[in-house]
């Protein structure tokens, strides 16, 4: 009788606990949980990564063009520079085309990355560049043009038709769910620059109500990903507007990004003083921070100045571009209006390495390596603008 009573109470307790656990999973991490997660990580430092022989995320991941040998070589170069994370873009069309094969290739990538002590951040959706992604062979780069083949996810056809949204839900739940407990992954970036109008020369192809559709879809994407109870944090990075400190002054997409993210991420391609002010604006949210896009040399955002500042402020730092290749992001954004076909830019815009693995500037590689070896928040002398070893006597 006592055992039966005890079992009855246990059944009631479990029944009561289950909805509570489910409710917790449906909410962003507590600030304490986010801080505890960050405390266990190395200071995140890396690049936005696509292999140099891929023009976009489709060419990176499709079975016919997936190149593990090149990825292994390039991530080996990254390891030698002290890089411990890479931000890597996925695509819903890849999952629709070949669910099992796509997940196997993700697993292969993760195995290669783990071999080089790199934990990637995977990006599920992206609102930038070509709004009409098409599977199969990708077009060659447009000469002299920045990111001339990058594609959005989802594309206009899907975004414009809510009947496709259940398939997007299945994609998010399957990808996140399949790797929800995989410690080789650092985080999930659910949507890159969701309220970006696209960029490039694609304005006529963008939905007129793109912002409204994304604003409605983004909270659902967070919910779909969170329903899989991943051990990795979710995030989506704010990237524009003058002040991120006051939610009431931000648009609906930005409010979702800042209130639904487990850790805060942001993009900044400005001078050091502006970068520092952006970090200060985001401090009030009380969560760990990663700058998931920076470094535009000719715009004032450099490895020499911004990366040590991020380290001092204990902000993870992920620059745009690793090996110069088919994305052509050594060319600046204005190349869409003025292609660099006659001569290269005076200074590379993005990217760290030549195609053969030689650093564009050895000093940048030295700074990244020195910063990655130092404790969080510590900028070693070797990473300062004028290290003692370089002093002129």
Regions found by a protein language model. Name each.
Residues 1-9:
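Bacterial N-terminal signal peptides that target proteins for export
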Residues 10-11, 21:
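Cleavable N-terminal signal peptides
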Residues 23, 122, 390-393:
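Low-complexity, Gly/Pro
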Residues 25-261, 267, 272-274, 285, ...:
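Active-site mouth of glycoside hydrolases
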Residues 331-391:
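Extended, alpha-helix-rich binding/interface surfaces that flank or overlap catalytic cores
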């Amino acid at each position: 009788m006592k055992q039966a009573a005890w079992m009855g109470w246990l059944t009631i307790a479990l029944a009561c606990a289950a909805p509570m656990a489910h409710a917790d999973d449906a909410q962003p991490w507590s600030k304490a949980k986010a801080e505890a997660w960050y405390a266990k990580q190395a200071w995140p430092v890396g690049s936005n990564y696509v292999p140099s022989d891929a023009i976009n995320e489709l060419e990176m991941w499709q079975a016919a063009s997936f190149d593990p040998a090149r990825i292994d070589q390039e991530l080996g170069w990254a390891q030698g520079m002290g890089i411990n994370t890479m931000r890597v873009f996925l695509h819903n069309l890849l999952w629709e085309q070949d669910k099992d094969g796509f997940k196997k290739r993700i697993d292969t990538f993760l195995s290669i990355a783990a071999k080089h002590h790199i934990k990637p951040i995977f990006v599920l959706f992206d609102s930038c560049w070509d709004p009409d992604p098409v599977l199969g062979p990708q077009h060659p780069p447009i000469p002299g043009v920045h990111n001339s083949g990058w594609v959005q996810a989802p594309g206009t056809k899907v975004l414009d038709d809510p009947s496709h949204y259940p398939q997007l839900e299945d994609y998010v739940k399957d990808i996140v769910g399949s790797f929800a407990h995989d410690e080789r992954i650092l985080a999930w970036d659910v949507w890159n620059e969701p309220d970006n109008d696209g960029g490039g020369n694609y304005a006529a192809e963008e939905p007129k109500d793109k912002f409204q559709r994304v604003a409605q879809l983004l909270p659902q994407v967070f919910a779909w990903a969170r329903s899989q109870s991943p051990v990795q944090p979710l995030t989506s990075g704010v990237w524009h507007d003058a002040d991120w400190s006051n939610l009431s002054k931000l648009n609906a997409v930005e409010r979702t990004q800042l209130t639904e993210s487990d850790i805060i991420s942001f993009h900044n391609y400005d001078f050091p003083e502006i970068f520092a002010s952006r970090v200060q604006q985001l401090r009030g949210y009380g969560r760990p921070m990663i700058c998931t896009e920076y470094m535009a040399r000719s715009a004032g955002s450099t490895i020499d100045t911004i990366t040590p500042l991020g380290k001092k402020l204990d902000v993870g730092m992920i620059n745009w571009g690793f090996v110069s290749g088919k994305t052509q992001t050594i060319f600046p954004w204005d190349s869409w209006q003025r292609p660099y076909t006659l001569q290269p830019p005076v200074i590379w815009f993005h990217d760290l390495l030549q195609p053969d693995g030689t650093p564009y500037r050895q000093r940048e590689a030295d700074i990244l390596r020195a910063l990655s070896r130092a404790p969080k928040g510590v900028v070693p002398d070797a990473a300062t603008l004028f290290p003692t070893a370089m002093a002129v006597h």
